Curated annotation (Swiss-Prot):
Name of the featured protein: Glutamate [NMDA] receptor subunit 1
UniProt cross-references to InterPro entries, sorted A to Z: ANF_lig-bd_rcpt, CaM-bd_C0_NMDA_rcpt_NR1, Glu/Gly-bd, Iono_Glu_rcpt_met, Ionotropic_Glu_rcpt, Iontro_rcpt_C, NMDA1-like_ligand-bd, NMDA1-like_N
Signal peptide: 1-22
Lineage of the species this protein comes from: Eukaryota, Metazoa, Ecdysozoa, Arthropoda, Hexapoda
One GO cellular component, as annotated: postsynaptic membrane
Compositionally biased region (Polar residues): 972-982
Organism for this UniProt entry: Drosophila grimshawi
Length: 982
């Protein structure tokens, strides 16, 4: 560890020694004396230059040890050629490292240019202290020139600050067609692009007036200026040209009240400058001594830093050597441009062109008798590190000797207005061929095509038209009203026309017409949002609103089976199953219960039959449907207990069904399907749910900038409509489930059609405002008028008249509050059920009749067969009887003959052959009215015995016999029956 520590210290020591050796070597390689050249305009400047360098050598802050500066000066010659020779012979041959140059303002700029050309050829830096022409900013020509004074065109920066201070938004620029005039215009346009990113009020150039120097008349340009809207004039002109411009402007009364002139330094010195003109004056502009000192110290500061960083080669010595390329001079020029010191003329710094920045200006106000009065300053603010404008507005005397700041713009009284069809705010009606004017409550609103020709004549009326009529009366303006050319409110399109890295927004529709100054005002339901407010002005909202959702009310759908809705399908199935299960259990309980059958007291009759299955099913259905039960009731106690429980179950089921049926068929339908924008079905849109808005509208922009709605917007983007009217029609038809749009329009549609309803609460709250151009003079007047309309109740009157439709809304509410009654549509299923029952009964009776006919035919065939068989059997028996009788007769005859005694023939019943013949009284089948148990018929021989009647014998009702067949008899002899003696 100790060895490593010592090794590190040795490395650090070696590095420090190397740095010190390098610095000593560099310092020893650099020159110790530096000659500074001066091309000055007078002896005082030359003397001050020498004195400044002498004092510099004793200032250790700027001069390193063993370094000495020497001055080499020459007098500026008006002849540029002589100046070139003097520079070569008296400065470059003396090895000057830089040149400070000044000249008289009246001598022109040719001599300083000659010094710049000559020195620049050898890369010798030149510091100008009085040259302010724009040409010196061109580094392709003046490669090594920089200056401690700003060029004239830098006054454009001060213009922007003044416009921002006075809140002027529209200007006219007047400039000469020379290099400086075009430079100040370019500077203004370029700087304004970045300057207005930090301020709220943006100034635009309405008109650019370019004139040739050495004017004789400016009248032609003044005519164009007078028709413009702006009354703020920014002028760059020479003193001579400014005199001509002021002379002609005075003749056209364009220098008096309401006109604002802001001019540069040269124009400020015209001998006819009007009262109220504002101009700029560079601080220390004529202080050559201050600029000489600042230039010398800037040079010393750059050389000192350069000495500490690199080796400086000696300056060139011979002008005749064209091959000299002094790289140290180029490097020294870069060091000079990076200087930033506090000098006698203020903060001294340079831009990339070597031009002075942070130069201070006085704001001059011209008063009576051409007196100049300082009313403000544009100076460097050290704490903030930038320039700051300070103007005392109360000290300014404006044109026409006014103390109040002019509006800076001519307020036109005839405006071009645009609107768009959007019910109920604007109704549009095409004029008929035989119509020449609109109705009293309408206003003409033609539709212009791209070429500007009238395509169609329309009439407009509605909420916004009534507002426009009242507004024009209140603030006193006339107007021409037209419809939006493309029928859209407008949205922006990102374009890159010039190939720049940044995209530019281009607006379409109504907004595009306003941005491109093809219209003065938009009177329509125009939603105020940040995207639009960046490019146009808005009045205070004339109606506050938000975004909501329009949908169709759920219909009172009544299907044929609507009477089954009180119970679910599962419950209906369970009820059906329960009926038959209970019937089966009743049958089993009554069948197997020992008490399920009973006997009559003191009776020897047979037992009654138990409850059969069909009777049990009939009983279960009868109890459930609350129908009378005439027969087939349970006999056993256990079955009757179950029957009572089943009756209670049936009562609960029927009561529940009745209550729920009323709820389903009579109660109000739900008003909406959606709960609002936070409904999960909207946030996670399903295939069977469609929602949409209007393409490029303010609602569309709202969804774009809301991150939490991005998923929903991606889904609905493909469904968006071109117009709101199309979307509303699709909602009515059921093609679109939810239309998201401005609440005012949707509330109007819902009040007009009772089948439509708005869902949920408002979101994205904003307002409708009147759109105007940026900086429009009508903005404040329109805003104040709208506020007065709100206070007076005029806006509320328009709401009731056009949006809410009081009578229609009342009818809808009455319709909603009316108790719902059941109609055929609701109970059609019940009637169909009855019809099915009737049809089923008819079908069953037909089946029964057909079956009975078939049975009767079959029974007849059986009876005929039985009768034939009986007849045949009787015939056979008769033949047998006859044969037997004949045989007996023969035997009898034989016996008689044998015994000669009388004989008899027996006709008694043959009991052995027909043992049950005496019991037949008819078929043993029950007759209607018989008891539940049919008793067997007793023998008729018991009747009359001992005085017993049929009812006492237990016969009950006796069946009358029809044509009873006589018993068959066979002849024969018997000992216990009567016989017939023949």
């Amino acid at each position: 560890m100790r060895v490593a520590f010592i090794y590190r210290w040795l490395l650090c020591g070696a590095a420090i020694v190397n740095v010190l050796v390098a610095q000593r070597h560099t310092a020893s390689d650099n020159p110790s004396t530096y000659n500074i050249g001066g091309v000055l305009s007078n002896s005082d400047s030359e003397e001050h230059f020498r004195t400044t360098i002498a004092h510099l050598n004793f200032d250790q802050q700027y001069v390193p040890r063993k370094v000495t500066y020497y001055d080499k000066t020459i007098r500026m010659d008006k002849n540029p050629i002589k100046t070139v020779f003097n520079v070569c012979d008296k400065l470059i041959e003396k090895r000057v490292y830089a040149v400070v140059v000044s000249h008289e303002q009246t001598s022109g700029d040719l001599s300083p240019a000659a010094v710049s050309y000559t020195s620049g050829f050898y890369s010798i830096p030149v510091i100008g202290i009085s040259s302010r022409d724009a040409a010196f900013s061109d580094k392709n020509i003046h490669v090594s020139f920089l200056r401690t004074v700003p060029p004239y065109y830098h006054q454009a920066d001060v213009w922007l600050e003044m416009l921002s201070h006075f809140l002027y938004t529209k200007v006219i620029i007047i400039h000469s067609s020379d290099t400086d005039g075009r430079a100040i215009l370019g500077r203004f346009q370029t700087t304004s692009q970045t300057y207005y990113d930090d301020v709220d009020v943006r100034a635009t150039v309405e008109l650019i007036v370019e004139f040739e120097p050495k004017l004789e008349s400016f009248t032609e340009h003044l005519i164009d200026m007078k028709t413009a809207q702006s009354r703020v004039y920014l002028m760059y002109a020479s003193t001579e040209d400014a005199q001509v411009i002021f002379r002609d402007a005075g003749e056209y009364n364009m220098t008096g009240e309401g006109h604002v002139w802001i001019v540069t330094e040269q124009a400020l010195h015209a001998n006819n400058t009007p009262d109220g003109v504002l101009g700029l004056q560079l601080e220390h502009a004529h202080s050559d001594k201050g600029h000489i000192r600042d230039s010398v110290y800037v040079l010393a500061s750059a050389i000192k830093e350069m000495i500490s960083n690199e080796t400086i080669a000696e300056a060139p010595k011979d002008c005749g050597d064209s091959a000299v390329n002094w790289e140290s001079g180029k490097r020294l020029f870069q060091y000079l441009k990076s200087r930033n010191i506090t000098g006698e003329t203020g903060q001294v710094a340079f831009d990339d062109n070597g031009d002075r920045i942070y130069a201070g200006y006085d704001v001059i106000n011209i008063r009576e008798h051409q007196k100049q009065h300082v009313v403000g300053k544009f100076s460097y603010d050290s704490p903030r590190g930038k320039m700051r404008m300070r103007i005392n507005d109360s000290e300014i005397i404006w044109g026409g000797k006014q103390k109040r700041k002019p509006e800076g713009i001519m307020i036109p009284t005839h405006l071009k207005l645009l609107t768009i069809e959007e019910k109920p705010f604007v109704y549009v009606r095409r004029m008929g061929d035989d119509e020449f004017r609109c109705e009293p409550d309408e206003r003409p609103c033609p539709l212009f095509n791209a070429s500007g020709a009238t395509a169609n004549e329309f009439c407009c009326r509605g909420y916004c038209i009534d507002l426009l009529i009242e507004l024009s009366k209140r603030i006193n303006f006339t107007y021409d009203l037209a419809l939006s050319p493309d029928g859209q409110f407008g949205h922006y399109i990102l374009r890159n026309n010039s190939g720049a890295m940044t995209l530019r927004k281009e607006w379409t529709g109504l907004i595009g017409e306003l941005v491109n100054e093809r219209a003065d005002m938009i009177v329509a339901p125009l939603t105020i949002n940040p995207e639009r407010a960046e490019y146009i002005e808005f009045s205070k909202p004339f109606k506050y609103q938000g975004i909501t959702i329009l949908e169709k009310k759920p219909s009172r759908s009544s299907t044929l089976v609507s009477f089954l809705q009180p119970f679910s399908n599962t419950l209906w199935i369970l009820v059906m199953v329960s009926v038959h299960v209970v019937a089966l259990v009743l049958y089993l309980l009554d069948r197997f219960s020992p008490f399920g059958r009973f006997k009559l007291s003191h009776s020897d009759s047979n037992e009654e039959k138990a409850l059969n299955l069909s009777s049990a099913v009939w009983f279960a259905w009868g109890v459930l449907l609350n129908s009378g039960i005439g027969e087939g009731t349970p006999r056993s106690f256990s079955a009757r207990v179950l029957g009572m429980v089943w009756a209670g179950f049936a009562m609960i089921i029927v009561a529940s069904y009745t209550a729920n049926l009323a709820a389903f068929l009579v109660l109000e339908r739900p008003k909406t399907k959606l709960s609002g924008i936070n409904d999960a079905r909207l946030r996670n849109t399903m295939e069977n749910l469609t929602c949409a808005t209007v393409k490029g509208s303010s609602v569309d922009m709202y969804f774009r900038r809301q991150v939490e709605l991005s998923n929903m917007y991606r889904t609905m983007e493909s469904n968006n409509y071109v117009t709101a009217e199309q979307a509303i029609q699709d909602v009515k038809k059921g093609k679109l489930m939810a239309f998201i749009w401005d609440s005012s329009r949707l509330e109007y549609e819902a009040s007009k059609d009772c089948e439509l309803v708005t869902a949920g609460e408002l979101f994205g709250r904003s307002g409708y405002g009147i759109g105007l151009q940026k900086g429009s003079p009508w903005t404040d007047a329109v805003t104040l008028a709208i506020l007065e309309f709100h206070e007076s109740g005029f806006m509320e009157k328009l709401d009731k008249q056009w949006i809410f439709h009081g009578h229609v809304q009342q009818n809808c509410e009455l319709f909603e509050k009316t108790p719902n009654t059941l109609g055929l549509k609701n109970m059609a299923g019940v009637f169909i059920l009855v019809g099915v029952g009737i049809a089923g009964g008819v079908g069953l009776i037909i089946i029964e009749v057909i079956y009975k006919k078939h049975q009767v035919k079959k029974q007849k065939r059986l009876d005929i067969a039985r009768h034939a068989a009986d007849k045949w059997r009787g015939t056979i028996e008769k033949r047998k009887t006859i044969r037997a009788s004949l045989a007996m007769q023969r035997q009898y005859n034989v016996g008689l003959m044998a015994t000669h005694a009388p004989g008899t023939i027996s006709l008694a019943v043959d009991k052995r052959r027909y043992p049950r013949l005496g019991q037949r009284l008819g078929p043993e089948r029950a007759w209607p009215g018989d008891g539940a148990d049919v008793l067997r018929i007793r023998r008729p021989y018991d009747l009359g015995k001992g005085g017993l009647t049929a009812s006492q014998l237990g016969l009950g009702k006796t069946r009358p016999q029809q044509n009873p067949l006589p018993p068959r008899y066979s002849p024969g002899y018997t000992s216990d029956v009567s016989h017939l003696v023949v």
